[in-house]
């Protein structure tokens, strides 16, 4: 916005046109005119919108309503919504519910909100994710949402809040590595731990999983590790990324010497090495001082007894329902927060 305003003031342009930014927030011009820039939902530049062009649809990672404008929204109704989990899905659900005129209580077990967004926001190469996190923190602060951090959520606590509807957004946990009959590796670490702590690792590093998290952790370690090898069983690393962004991301990693093995699968571990089945079907031994797991997530539901013990409607959203990406998390959060209380399930 500052750059656009400067161009207009200098007379360098008569009009500044925006594309993806207006998909992320169609109200951007109005909010800018009202000097309310912090309320503008930022575009991530993730090109999710471009991915849907081929099927003649428009979607947006951060704007779940894009392409769904004609969907009927229930009339505002009173009621108390309790949201468990302050990650992207939970934050979106809480804001959507508050916007429908409901009393909202948000419970988060950590000392700060954001969940997986905090991991992405820590990248210098991803400044838009920090802006998105700031946007959510600003919006929940403005909304009349009761936020409880460092919350130990249990059945008694939820019952005491007397919710009319419960939205569970407790996220997922890293998928473990299961290799029957394999020798345990001496140094195994989850990729999410490295992204959270920015731990520096040296020596020969093998990353199992070439999804977005695998690419992120390889980027973090590329300046300290002697050599990084990514093992990906699919035909393309970073397959969730839009094609042009994926090409740039992979080119950057290769520039730092990261080796990416496609159509390859880890078949067993040794104390300081791994054995991989390569595309030709042969076995290949790779030195691995550190084994980093980026195998995705599995749902986490720390309160399985809630479903039976509480009579109020309950909705599971985000990774605790089905691990996916930010687009799915925010879409499920918006839908759950907007739904009629009697229809949450």
Regions found by a protein language model. Name each.
Residues 11-12, 143, 162, 183-184, ...:
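Short, structured coil segments at secondary-structure junctions
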Residues 11, 33-36, 122-126, 184-185, ...:
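Short, hinge-like loop/turn segments at secondary-structure boundaries
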Residues 1-84, 88, 92, 96-99, ...:
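Flavin-dependent oxidoreductase catalytic cores
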Residues 8, 75-109, 113, 148-159, ...:
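Rossmann-like dinucleotide/flavin-binding elements
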Residues 103-143, 220-266, 324:
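Rossmann-like dinucleotide-binding cores of NAD(P)H-dependent redox enzymes
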Residues 17-18, 150, 168, 263:
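Short beta-strand and adjacent tight-turn residues that come in two discontinuous sequence segments
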Residues 272-277:
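Short polybasic amphipathic segments
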């Amino acid at each position: 916005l500052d750059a656009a305003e400067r161009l207009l003031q200098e007379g360098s342009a008569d009009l500044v046109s925006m594309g993806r930014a207006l998909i992320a927030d169609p109200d951007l011009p109005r909010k800018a005119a009202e000097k309310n820039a912090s309320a503008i939902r930022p575009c991530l530049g993730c090109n999710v919108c471009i991915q849907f062009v081929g099927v003649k649809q428009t979607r947006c990672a951060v704007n779940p309503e894009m392409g769904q404008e004609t969907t009927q929204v229930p009339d505002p109704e009173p009621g108390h919504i309790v949201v468990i989990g302050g990650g992207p899905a939970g934050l979106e659900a809480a804001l959507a519910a508050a916007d429908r005129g409901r009393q909202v209580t948000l419970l988060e077990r950590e000392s700060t909100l954001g969940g997986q967004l905090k991991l992405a926001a820590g990248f210098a190469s991803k400044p838009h994710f920090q802006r998105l996190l700031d946007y959510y923190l600003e919006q929940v602060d403005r909304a009349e949402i009761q936020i409880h951090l460092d919350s130990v959520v249990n059945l008694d606590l939820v019952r005491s809040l007397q919710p009319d509807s419960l939205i569970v957004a407790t996220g997922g946990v890293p998928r473990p590595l299961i290799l029957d009959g394999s020798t345990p590796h001496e140094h195994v670490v989850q990729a999410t731990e490295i992204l959270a702590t920015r731990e520096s690792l040296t020596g020969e590093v093998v990353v199992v999983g070439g999804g977005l998290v695998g690419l992120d952790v390889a980027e973090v370690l590329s300046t300290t590790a002697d050599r990084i090898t990514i093992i990906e069983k699919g035909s393309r690393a970073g397959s969730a990324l839009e094609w042009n962004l994926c090409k740039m991301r992979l080119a950057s990693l290769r520039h730092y010497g990261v080796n990416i093995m496609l159509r390859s699968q880890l078949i067993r571990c040794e104390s300081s090495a791994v054995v991989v089945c390569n595309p030709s079907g042969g076995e290949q031994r790779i030195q691995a001082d550190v084994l980093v797991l980026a195998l995705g997530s599995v749902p986490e539901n720390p309160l399985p007894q809630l479903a039976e013990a509480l009579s109020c409607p309950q909705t599971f959203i985000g990774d605790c329902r089905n691990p996916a990406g930010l687009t799915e998390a925010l879409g499920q959060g918006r839908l759950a927060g907007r739904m009629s209380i009697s229809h949450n399930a």
